[in-house]
Amino acid sequence: MIDTKTAIAVLGNVTLDIICNSVDDVPRHDSISFQEAAVTPGGCGSNTAIGLSREGEKVYLVACTGDDLSADLLHQTWEKIGIDTSFTKRFTDQGSGVSVGLVDSDFQPRFIHTAGANKYLRPESVQPEKLKEQGVGFFHVAGYFVLPGLLNAGFEQKLSLLQEKDIFVSLDVVTSPAMEKPEHLWPLLPFLNLFLCNLREAEILTGHGDPESASGVLHQKGATAVVIKLGSKGCWLSEKGLGKLIPAPLVNNVIDTTGAGDAFAAGLLAALRKGENLDEACRTGIYLASKTVQYLGAVNIS
């Protein structure tokens, strides 16, 4: 049985985000202007960890950065917010990940990205024994498909060891060309308590554009519980083949959807850690996501 009086560890990509709003077109040879910008920590791992810390959770971040000015800003922010980085490694010969997000007039971001030190995040970065010693009861993988070091054999063994220690394991993918060949994902599904993706990702992975059919394929592949994020429509929750739509409230002041999925994951995990069931946890995730889309950038660190 999972002990809910525990910490949460987040493994995932971390970047310095530069978000530009709004940019609808990028001519090849011309300069362009935009209205506003935000420079913040980013990446699925950092976003989710910050969201959890904002909810009052004890959070360990399992990540890799370079040893540069970008990393200094990231670490300073994490320390200020209260995230434990004892499982985060700095590499002196490598730059940190950086993402430039171009948010269009429909509030949708496009990213120019360099992975930097994120490529060094590998199965051996997961230390089940040490995580358990630190009181970790929940382990979340954020941005799986943009972590090339995890797209190989061996990661499922680490997830299995986490579950053997009664640690709740969840995994959230992120849109990436690597999704076109999902064979690395399938062996992981039986070792997850919860699998998350959005509808576009679900269609790429399963070939089905409706959440019920997509969930069915994911269950056949070994997933126990599936949450498919549906943006402004809420999410689809499927447990043991029984699915239902959990609607989202209307949000009038949408500015930028960057990081909404990570905010959803943070709210969901925080609620599960407090002992709520998956239905209740999804509603908490939707609430946090609805707040995130009302400001520029994935996180609000003010």
Predicted regions and their residues:
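Short, glycine-/polar-rich solvent-exposed loops and beta-turns at beta-strand/coil boundaries
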Residues: 92-94
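Conserved phosphate-binding/catalytic region of the ribokinase-like
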Residues: 2-9, 34, 161, 211-302
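Ribokinase/PfkB-type carbohydrate-kinase core domain
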Residues: 1-14, 77-90, 103-194, 199-245
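Generic secondary-structure signature for well-ordered alpha-helical cores
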Residues: 16, 20, 54, 83, ...
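Short, glycine/acidic-enriched loop or turn micro-motifs at the edges of active sites
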Residues: 16, 20, 67, 175, ...
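Glycine-rich phosphate/adenosyl-contacting loop at the front of the ribokinase-like
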Residues: 1-64, 69-83
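Short, conserved phosphate/pyrophosphate- and ester-handling motifs at nucleotide-, phospho-/glycolipid
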Residues: 52, 198, 261
